């Protein structure tokens, strides 16, 4: 049993416990239950309360004696007798069950809506009749006064099947394209159908007329919600004559009063998953809504969360046992969960012992690996030398490895490594010796990194400990895990030769000296029993101020000295680099021509002129051979041409002519620099 406490509400998971491997036979399971205490003490409230693979629907009969569940694979329905706490019967079906309902007080009359459009009517002995509906069905509801079954599905029509006459009646035509869910109010028998457009249509079964239309899509959307599409109705449930709860495909539950089109309250599951089931708990005024991930219980008046359940597997259906605190869920897993919440109500009459048992039980988390078997991978099998056992009964394939008996594993492990116990023993002895050493008087060892800083911190700690007055101990950096890396990682080593450290060190040292002096003065003041404002003896305030100014001058001079030294060192390094550059002799660099290339001189102009006289087709062929032209196909199917343009000969000649003309103009120009004007008449003319 697993116990969880959500919002101060205890939830007991009666299905959680040590499970047995599926490959074991019934005889071995019984033998294991006798030997293993954990298996024997686990709580199996109802025997074989599970499905082969997945359970899709679960319901309780109106008399409370029978629990019926549908699942797969293969499609089947199982009936459990609560008085006997065991399986009463099991029936296999031809197709998966979409929805089923119990029409009688016990299990004698059941209707199954299957995924292949068939509807099966079962009696106490088995299948009574089988018929088909025109469209694929998604939900149905039974109207007790008229014995009519209302089927909804992938159609705009609501099909009516009268069980008294044994024939179909006229269908109800809706405005929707498809209908997901339907329900009938037990008080006044109002029929409601939830559509994919996010609307709820209400019909009167007596007149077969629509009496109301409610748009829930806009009501479920709030200001702080992000909705990608139009929400459709995925769940529908009446509560009393006036209230109706609507669940949407985007994860909202909206509560309505039938007299108004405005919602009383809207609750968001915050997961964005379709609401699959809605139940009401009348005693505490709670709404139990469930999507595939979570089951939430909240107050229908103010929306305050009462508690919530998050199963390990996805939820398909939820059933609340009447007048109790027991909850059943159909999951995407073989085991169907049974939850007991004492805050909701007492345990049912057939398991009243739970009230006394839950007080004594403690939380036992479910084990994911069987204790009697060891999970090993193929690599571990190779290391143990057991690869030849693959395929034998000693190894059971599971996921990416195998299950093997734990006793066999220990034997093989001891044979492969016979000294494992000796190594384990030595390790334990070493741990005991280290624990004993820790109790002795320890000498403080300096760390490998930042030894000077650690020594300084040790000295400050000793000075504080030697003081007479007891002060509150400040946390030490050496013992703080946050600064542990600073004394272990060499990357945090303080470089005392760096420029920043040498400039800051005089200032830091002077500040520490001033701090020590102030501490001594404060100690003297505390020791004296004179007046509070009395100055220290033999030390007036003027002398103290003059001393502080002298200290400031001292560290300023020290900083200047360090700056001067740094400049000198930088100058020396530059001179050394220049000297090294002068001493190094530069050697000529040789370049190797690639294989297949030829050295060409500058006398290829004639060849280029001949090439320019040729046609474009001939030039393209020559350029492709030389490699200066690149033609490639693109992904779309076109071609891409890449080439290099060269200057024309005429353009080059024109540039040379312009250059020659400018030089001639410079030679023929006559300068007027020898002409000078008088200073009084203005600037000289140049």
Swiss-Prot record:
Is Nucleus one of the keywords UniProt gives this record? yes
Location of the region described as Disordered in the Swiss-Prot/TrEMBL record: 526-590, 649-686
What residue ranges carry the coiled-coil annotation? 420-470, 555-587, 639-676
Localization in the cell: Nucleus, Nucleolus
Question: Where is this chain compositionally biased, Basic residues type?
Answer: 667-686
Keywords in UniProt for this one? Answer: Coiled coil, Nucleus, Repeat, WD repeat
Chief subcellular location: nucleus
Stretches of Basic and acidic residues bias are at 551-582, 655-666
Any Gene Ontology CC annotation: nucleolus
Q: Which SMART domains match?
A: WD40
Annotated WD repeats reside at: 50-90, 174-213, 228-266, 270-308, 310-349
Regarding protein family, the annotation reads: Belongs to the WD repeat NOL10/ENP2 family.
Q: Indicate what this protein is called per its UniProt record.
A: Nucleolar protein 10
Q: What is the lineage of its organism?
A: Eukaryota, Metazoa, Chordata, Craniata, Vertebrata
Gene designation: nol10
């Amino acid at each position: 049993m697993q116990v969880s406490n959500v919002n101060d509400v205890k939830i007991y998971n009666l299905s959680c416990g040590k499970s047995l491997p599926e490959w074991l036979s019934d005889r071995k399971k019984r033998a294991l239950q006798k030997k293993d205490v954990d298996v024997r003490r686990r709580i199996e409230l109802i025997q074989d309360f599970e499905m082969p693979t997945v359970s899709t629907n679960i319901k309780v009969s109106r008399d409370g004696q029978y629990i019926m569940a549908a699942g797969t694979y293969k499609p089947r329905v199982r009936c459990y007798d609560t008085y006997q706490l065991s399986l009463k019967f099991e029936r296999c079906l031809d197709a998966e069950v979409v929805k089923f309902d119990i029409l009688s007080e016990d299990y004698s009359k059941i209707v199954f809506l299957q995924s292949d459009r068939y509807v099966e009517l079962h009696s106490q002995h088995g299948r009574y009749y089988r018929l088909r509906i025109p469209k694929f069905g998604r939900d149905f509801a039974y109207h007790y006064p008229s014995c009519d079954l209302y089927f909804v599905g992938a159609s705009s029509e609501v099909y009516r099947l009268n069980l008294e006459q044994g024939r179909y009646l006229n269908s109800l035509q809706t405005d929707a394209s498809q209908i997901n869910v339907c329900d009938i109010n037990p008080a006044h028998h109002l029929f409601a159908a939830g559509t994919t457009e996010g609307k709820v249509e209400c019909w009167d079964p007596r007149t077969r007329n629509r009496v109301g239309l409610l748009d829930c899509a806009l009501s479920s959307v709030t200001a702080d919600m992000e909705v990608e599409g139009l929400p459709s109705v995925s769940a529908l449930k009446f509560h009393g004559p006036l209230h109706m709860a609507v669940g949407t495909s985007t994860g909202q539950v909206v509560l309505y009063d039938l007299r108004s089109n405005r919602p009383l309250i809207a609750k968001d599951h915050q997961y964005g998953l379709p609401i699959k089931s809605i139940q009401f708990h009348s005693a505490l005024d709670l709404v139990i809504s469930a999507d595939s991930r979570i089951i939430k219980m909240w107050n229908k008046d103010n929306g305050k969360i009462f508690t919530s359940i998050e199963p390990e597997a996805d939820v398909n259906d939820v059933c609340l046992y009447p007048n109790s605190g027991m909850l059943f869920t159909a999951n995407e897993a073989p085991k169907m969960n049974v939850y007991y919440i004492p805050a909701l109500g007492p345990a049912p009459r057939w398991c009243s012992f739970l009230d006394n048992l839950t007080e004594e039980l403690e939380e036992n988390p479910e084990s994911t690996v069987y204790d009697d078997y060891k999970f090993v991978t193929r690599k571990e099998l190779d290391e143990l030398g057991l690869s030849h056992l693959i395929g034998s009964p000693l190894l059971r394939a599971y996921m990416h490895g195998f299950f093997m008996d734990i006793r066999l594993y220990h034997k093989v492990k001891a044979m492969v490594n016979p000294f494992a116990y000796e190594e384990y023993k030595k390790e334990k002895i070493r741990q005991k010796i280290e624990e004993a050493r820790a109790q002795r008087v320890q000498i403080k060892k300096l760390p490998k990194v930042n030894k000077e800083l650690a020594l300084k911190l040790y000295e400050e700690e000793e000075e504080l400990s030697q003081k007479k007055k007891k002060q509150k101990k400040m946390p030490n950096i050496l013992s703080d895990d946050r600064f542990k890396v600073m004394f272990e990682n060499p990357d945090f080593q303080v470089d005392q030769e760096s420029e920043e450290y040498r400039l800051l060190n005089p200032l830091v040292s002077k500040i520490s000296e001033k701090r020590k002096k102030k501490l001594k003065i404060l100690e003297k003041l505390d020791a004296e029993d004179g007046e509070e404002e009395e100055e220290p003896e033999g030390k007036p305030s003027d002398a103290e101020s003059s001393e502080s100014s002298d200290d400031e001058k001292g560290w300023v001079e020290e900083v200047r000295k360090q700056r001067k030294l740094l400049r000198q060192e930088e100058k020396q390094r530059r001179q050394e680099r220049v000297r090294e550059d002068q001493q190094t002799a530069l050697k000529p660099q040789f370049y190797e021509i690639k294989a297949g290339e030829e050295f060409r001189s500058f006398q290829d102009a004639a060849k280029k002129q001949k090439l320019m006289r040729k046609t474009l087709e001939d030039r393209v062929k020559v350029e492709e051979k030389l490699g200066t032209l690149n033609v490639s196909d693109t992904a779309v199917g076109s071609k891409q041409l890449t080439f290099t343009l060269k200057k024309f000969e005429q353009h080059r000649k024109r540039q040379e002519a312009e250059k020659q003309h400018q030089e001639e103009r410079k030679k023929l120009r006559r300068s007027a620099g020898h002409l000078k004007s008088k200073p009084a008449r203005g600037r000289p003319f140049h």
